[in-house]
């Protein structure tokens, strides 16, 4: 199976202009506003973690409350309710201020479909349980970055270069607090892998000056 972070494509319902200002907590300082909303919505849909607050409250919604709201995951996925309707009906504010813009990867130009992907960090609300949706995610788990890399190296999981590189960067830190501190000291630089052909095979590589220590992935062995 493929190991991925929760996420997906921005939807019209994620547009800040479509959401009443009172529905969104103060936006994070980094990353496009619409994509911050997308990150929270997709994480809720795919793994039930909800970065939101009850209106007038400072803490995140409780694990019990998040579980009670779980049926909205499928309503949002199916287009049976909008994000604005969900938030207004349940008196919630998105906690965009908890997001930290971590990375920006752009699909190589030789690919038929290209994406401009932004990664965000956030500390999971206490006691909230990650639960797969059975559609976009079939299994969810908390794994330390170093352990995830071991599972990828062993062939237990497959992963794309952006996932591997981000895991490598995080594995250099002792804990979540250090990952966040480290990211706040960095500028987010758009990264586009390039294809390199060598005698040993084809490689995807990124520049060595964009903040990653792991910079390549073999995608095809040599036929020689």
Where are these regions (language model features)?
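NUDIX/MutT-family hydrolases
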Residues: 85-90, 96-105, 114-124, 131-157
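Structured loops at beta-to-helix junctions and adjacent beta-edge loops in soluble globular domains
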Residues: 8, 102-105, 123-125, 170, ...
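Charged mid-protein connector segments
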Residues: 58-102, 107
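Core RNA-modification/binding signature centered on pseudouridine synthases
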Residues: 161-224
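Short clusters of hydrophobic/aromatic residues that line enzyme substrate/ligand-binding pockets
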Residues: 5, 83, 195
